[in-house]
Amino acid sequence: DFNCLPGWSAYDQHCYQAFNEPKTWDEAERFCTEQAKRGHLVSIGSDGEADFVAQLVTNNIKRPELYVWIGLRDRRKEQQCSSEWSMSASIIYVNWNTGESQMCQGLARWTGFRKWDYSDCQAKNPFVCKFPSEC
């Protein structure tokens, strides 16, 4: 059994919280790293986790913007584009909105916060943080 901090929700041995205060992607990632050891913007690894996060956003983001930041952004190196999670996990599960895989990624409101879509990294959006729970 494991515990999350007060105000955080547990799923599959990780703790999650949705935050209403709009931040840029970098500001949100920095905020998440300050909340807990190994904290980052949320990574999503399965349909079940996507459902959990979508429900968390629906229940906790008071005035949802078009996007809610997740921990995925494009890294551009020598004309090669690759997406990676902020927590440096490799991408195994993907759920892009059709044709979208550039800039910073957010959960799109018009998909019920289930599909990923791009947004300008400097846009200010609500966000979800995630960290591994302590045993």
From Swiss-Prot:
Domain of life (superkingdom): Eukaryota
Localization per record: Secreted
This protein's GO CC annotations: extracellular region
Protein name: Snaclec rhodocetin subunit gamma
Function comment: Potent inhibitor of collagen-induced platelet aggregation. It acts by binding to the integrin alpha2A domain and blocks collagen binding to integrin alpha-2/beta-1 (ITGA2/ITGB1). The gamma/delta subunits mainly contribute to this activity.
Species of the source: Calloselasma rhodostoma (Malayan pit viper)
Covalent S-S links between cysteines: 4-15, 32-129, 104-121
UniProt key word Disulfide bond: yes
